Curated annotation (Swiss-Prot):
Stated name of the protein: Dihydroorotate dehydrogenase B (NAD(+)), catalytic subunit
Active-site annotation: 128
Positions annotated to bind substrate: 44, 68-72, 125, 190-191
Pathway participation: Pyrimidine metabolism; UMP biosynthesis via de novo pathway; orotate from (S)-dihydroorotate (NAD(+) route): step 1/1
NCBIfam families linked: PRK07259.1, pyrD_sub1_fam
Organism per entry: Caldanaerobacter subterraneus subsp. tengcongensis (strain DSM 15242 / JCM 11007 / NBRC 100824 / MB4)
Coiled coil: none
Gene, per the UniProt record: pyrD
Pfam families: DHO_dh (PF01180)
Quaternary structure annotation from Swiss-Prot or TrEMBL: Heterotetramer of 2 PyrK and 2 PyrD type B subunits.
Keyword Thylakoid among UniProt keywords: no
Protein localization: Cytoplasm
Length: 301
């Protein structure tokens, strides 16, 4: 049975990867699951310098989802290379690094810095809706997406993935801009912009006011957007948004995603990724499917 897929130059042993953010740098989850079983690990978003992130509260539960306002807390690109990468290199799993810059130059700087052994791919975060400057502004403008993608593509030999925001009028235009800029793949969706209010204080729950909604609540939005993007680009698409089990994952594969990423589910169930891999295998066995590629894009309209 073949579960392997290719995203740019990266060969994944199966199509299940971690979404940036909820999996940290893999250390905590390595105590629960065998990281070698994953298709790839996408690490928490990195910035040029360390960031402390937003003041608490940072997470707020909503109906069928979570709002987060983390603010890209991370140790910075240098500390990642020094402290986290050696740990990740000890596993037989491709490592993809998510980068978040406040300027085009910062994206390029990080891409150059991460063009090293042990890293297979760069995921450009043009879509994080948490930070007051940077991500959001880039991700809603197709010209900016094209510009960043083109410059990062020139700066690295690694597979370049562009992660799109759903908070746009037409995500297809953004996807085409990323492809035109030289992206090897597109990942979507990032969180959906949302907010919550404390009715006793009559204030927003988050100091930043707006947070990012993830979890099962956004799955139908994500699925629709992945379906739309697959029809307009010829590069691989990584689908994510509310995937909680193997059935959710299969929906994304059937509409045409080459791989899927698991985010919020990792918080709920640390075994989630490997359970999804096992579920896909079982589905293939029961339906006498020998190759995962028979499922990808098999939707009948």
């Amino acid at each position: 049975m073949n579960l392997s897929v290719e995203i740019g130059k990266i060969k994944l042993k199966n199509p299940v990867i971690t979404a940036s953010g909820t999996f940290g740098f893999g250390r905590e989850y390595s105590e629960y699951i065998d990281l070698n079983k994953l298709g790839a690990i996408v690490v928490k978003g990195l910035t040029v310098k360390p960031r402390e992130g937003n003041p608490p509260p940072r997470l707020f539960e909503t109906a069928s989802g979570i709002l987060n306002s983390i603010g890209l807390q991370n140790p910075g690109v240098d500390a990642f290379i020094e402290r986290e990468l050696p740990f990740l290199k000890s596993f037989d799993v491709p490592v993809i690094v998510n980068i978040a810059g406040e300027t085009v130059e910062e994206f390029v700087y990080m891409a150059e810095k991460l063009d090293i052994e042990g890293i297979e791919g760069i995921e450009i975060n043009v879509s994080c809706p948490n930070v007051k400057k940077g991500g959001m502004a880039f991700g809603v403008n197709p010209d900016d997406i094209f510009d960043i993608t083109r410059k990062v593509r020139k700066a690295t030999s690694k597979t370049v993935i562009v992660k799109l925001t759903p908070n746009v009028t037409d995500i297809k235009v953004c996807a085409k801009a990323a492809e035109k800029g030289g992206a090897d793949a597109i990942s979507l969706i990032n969180t959906v912009a949302g907010m919550a209010v404390d009715i006793d204080k009559r204030r927003p729950v988050f100091e930043n006011v707006i947070g990012g909604l993830s979890g099962p609540a956004i799955k139908p939005i994500a699925l629709k957007m992945v379906y739309e993007v697959v029809t307009v680009v010829s590069i691989p698409v990584i689908g994510m948004g509310g995937i909680m089990n193997y059935k959710d994952a299969l929906e994304f594969l059937i509409v045409g995603a080459r791989a899927i990423a698991v985010g919020t589910c990792n918080f709920v169930n640390p075994y989630c990724t490997v359970e999804i891999i096992d579920g896909i295998k079982k589905y293939m066995e029961e339906n006498e499917i020998e190759d995962i590629n028979e499922i990808i894009g098999s939707i009948k309209i």
